[in-house]
């Protein structure tokens, strides 16, 4: 049929509005997802969180000498929570992380200390880029590690991958499957609701005839909007637990809602910034931890029916310097703390190997050394929980699979074939 000028204008305006409401990275949707697939949520703490200030070796003389003015006590008022030992060194959890202590005691939460990006950069942007592309020392990698993981597993589902930010993170760079959704109720054609059906019909008609490279992505975006709308009631989402107020909780609720809509969500990412504590670290870190731990605790309880297939990892680009600075803060460091939460996590433990805090044991004599590459943590989750053995593709620079025992699952025969060069162009449309 011939398009009228009115159809063209309505369709184009709605297309622009639709793209603003749900940005995409070259979507590729299929049939609804396998309900047995695991769900993986990545929480990135932007700014370099102070891992050694969250899980601390309070009895260590070197630690006290470096941080006595900015740490918490092991007993008395404001005391931390005892966690147990790593490498025969006892550790305490920050007192503002009480919600994490509950998850730790229920054996759903594990910590991995002295972990992180082995590249020595102290640049926020370089470190985040290296980590999220999954190729330390190589910023020219044109895809993110989660993009390559999803390519290896041939994702199905209406919305297999989502991010709650305004743009996709580098871990989803080049993804043909990912959308950004910060508010599920607003994931729709924007404009007057009276004309919503007409706008969508016009846009479908335009893209069915143009033959442009945008046809596939636009049509798939419309399909995802229609599928979410069909499953999503008009009323705001009502969780089964109470979340604290704030943007972090809003992002977590959006993910929880998408999981419950059964649209085949397999991977979700979100960012939580504000961890660059160069000054006044005690109040800032305490407030950040309180919000992070209570929000994740609420999110986990909200998804109680999904615990058996839910894994959450929390990480940051680097840790902080061991010694406090003159502004009652800490500067950019190296070794850090990662956290893994889920129904198949071997929680209630601290994993890794503690390197010590004597000068000779520190990285460059000033920072906590790294004894566990962050890719070791992610690789175990990818293999045992996400059932992907293509580590050569996901993390092309590693050559060994050395699980720590973080999560339960089957160790597959690892395929070290990278397939990296052939995949980089992302020519699939």
Segments and roles (model prediction):
Residues 1-305, 323, 337-341, 346-417:
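Feature for exported/extracytoplasmic and membrane-associated proteins, marking the mature portion
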Residues 428-429:
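Short, solvent-exposed mixed-charge patches
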Residues 334:
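Glycine-rich and small/hydrophobic secondary-structure elements
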Residues 421-422:
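Short structural boundary motif marking the start of a folded domain
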């Amino acid at each position: 049929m011939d398009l009228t000028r009115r159809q063209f204008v309505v369709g184009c305006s709605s297309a622009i509005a639709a793209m603003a409401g749900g940005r995409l990275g070259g979507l590729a949707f299929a049939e609804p997802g396998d309900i047995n697939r695991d769900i993986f949520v990545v929480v990135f703490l932007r700014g370099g969180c102070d891992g050694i200030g969250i899980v601390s070796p309070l009895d260590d003389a070197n630690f006290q000498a470096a941080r006595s003015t900015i740490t918490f006590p092991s007993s008395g008022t404001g005391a931390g929570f005892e966690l147990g030992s790593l490498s025969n060194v006892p550790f305490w959890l920050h007192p503002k992380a009480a919600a994490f202590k509950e998850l730790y005691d229920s054996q759903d939460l594990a910590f991995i200390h002295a972990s992180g990006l082995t590249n020595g950069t102290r640049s926020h942007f370089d470190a985040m880029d290296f980590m999220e592309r999954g190729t330390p020392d190589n910023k020219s990698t044109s895809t993110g590690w989660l993009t390559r993981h999803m390519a290896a597993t041939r994702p199905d589902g209406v919305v297999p991958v989502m991010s709650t930010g305004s743009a996709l993170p580098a871990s989803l760079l080049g993804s043909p499957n990912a959308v950004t959704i910060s508010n599920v109720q607003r994931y729709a054609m924007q404009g007057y609701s009276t004309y919503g059906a007409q706008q969508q019909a016009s846009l479908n008609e335009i893209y069915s005839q143009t033959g442009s490279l945008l046809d596939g992505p636009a049509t798939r975006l419309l399909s995802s909007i229609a599928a979410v709308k069909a499953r999503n009631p008009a009323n705001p989402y009502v969780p089964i637990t109470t979340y604290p107020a704030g943007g972090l909780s809003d992002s977590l609720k959006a993910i929880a809602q998408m999981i419950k809509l059964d649209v085949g969500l397999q991977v979700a990412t979100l960012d939580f910034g504000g961890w660059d504590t160069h000054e006044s670290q005690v109040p800032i870190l305490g407030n950040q931890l309180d919000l992070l731990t209570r929000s994740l605790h609420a999110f986990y309880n909200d998804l109680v029916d999904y615990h058996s297939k839910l894994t959450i990892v929390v990480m940051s680009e680097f840790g902080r310097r061991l010694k406090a600075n003159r502004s009652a803060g800490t500067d950019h460091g190296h070794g850090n703390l990662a956290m893994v939460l889920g129904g198949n996590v071997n929680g209630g433990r601290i994993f890794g190997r503690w390197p010590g805090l004597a000068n000779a044991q520190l990285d460059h004599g000033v920072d906590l050394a790294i004894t566990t590459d962050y890719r070791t943590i992610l690789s175990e989750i990818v293999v045992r929980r996400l059932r992907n053995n293509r580590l050569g593709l996901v993390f092309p620079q590693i050559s060994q699979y050395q699980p720590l025992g973080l999560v339960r699952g089957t160790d597959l025969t690892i395929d070290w074939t990278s397939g990296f060069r052939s995949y980089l162009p992302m020519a699939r449309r």
